[in-house]
Amino acid sequence: MKQFMDENFLLETETAQDLFHNHAAKMPIIDYHCHLIPEMVANDHKFKSITELWLGGDHYKWRAMRTNGVDERYCTGTDTTDWEKFEKWAETVPYTFRNPLYHWTHLELKTAFGITKQLSPKTAREIYDECNEKLQLPEYSARGLMRRYHVECVCTTDDPIDDLRYHKQTRESGFEIKMIPAWRPDKAMNIEKPDFAEYMNKLGEVAGVTLTTFKDMVDALQKRHDFFAENGCKLSDHGIEEFYDEPYTDSQIETIFAKAMRGQQLSALEIRQYKHAFLKVSAEMDHAADWTQQYHYGAIRDNNTLMYNKLGPDTGFDSIGEFTTAKAMSNFLNELNMEGKLTRTILYCLNPCANEVIATMLGNFQDGSCPGKIQFGSGWWFNDQLDGMTKQMNALSVLGLLSRFVGMLTDSRSFLSYPRHEYFRRLLCNLLGNDVEKGLLPNDKESLARMVEDISYNNARNYFKFY
């Protein structure tokens, strides 16, 4: 019987072990999509407890705790202590067997704090106290944790109206790890939301544009896009339910925009026409700036209205959707390609039934301008686990070029999520090692090592043009 989470965790063959320990493990981390709070990096935030670091804002854990029968006050409440929240999480952990949370929890304890005991009610107090004691040390600050995991670059997720002051502060402080903003204009796209007009007014104010028409909005966005570029931004991200290809005219979009600004109800068709027009304009800006564009699609968000009204978005009430969007995706990418305005693109699906859809879509629009111009993003959100990442890499392997994959990202708000890169790299090495063991791949150590190092780091470094 193997030991739990020993040095060869997930590595089932000698080839896998060699690839990980001698190649993957030594590569720095480029975390090109995350949700870190820039202020915490800029001010080198010191965490008052493991509860703040681990449970503050982590909807993955909240979701598991609720499922385990834990009252909401121990997840998001303000009338419970840090210890009480941690204790409830420790009570939940033994029930997360076979959930990625169990692996993540113990990888984080091991790599950050050197703790190899399993978290449970029996060990909760001891682990809580040891973590909190270490969090008082300088090397456990926000920046210290990034250094610990050999992070080289992170890309935060930022709204067009953000002033990026904390990115500038971090840059000017001489911090050796790059923190780059990423453009996420969802609030300008979501015309059906009740606060759309209010947001447009804020956008106009920040951009210095009197915003009354769609053209005004595009002008305002372009100014903010330029501002982001001046501050080092190299990529955009769009959270969409599906792709849109409904035909529209400029006059139709102006009419739709005017209705929304007056607070009038829009039809489903009008909403889709606007989103198509918006994403088209956004893609044109990205192409002109030589950015990479990312599309995360397929989530049904904020399913629980009662809890949304209490807690807001991103609190653990989202799920996988069923959207038939392959044709619209193809039409949208083709439209950009026909006009010579299709920039480097990463496609992420939340529903794994679309893995092969995306993996085959990539080849339609590769043009030889760079390796893997159109990418299949790593297993996202609910797929960020062994089975989901395996399925994503298998689909990419058989229908594209796994060797040109830009690899892993945390997509996380936590400074303790970097072991997910290790988790991914171990899995990658194991997939290749097993293929060698079965005679499906040659035991070409040089080629295998290069492939692992490229997917772990080199491909992302070359693809995003951060340097």
What are these model-predicted stretches?
Residues 267-268, 317-323:
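A short acidic, glycine-rich active-site loop
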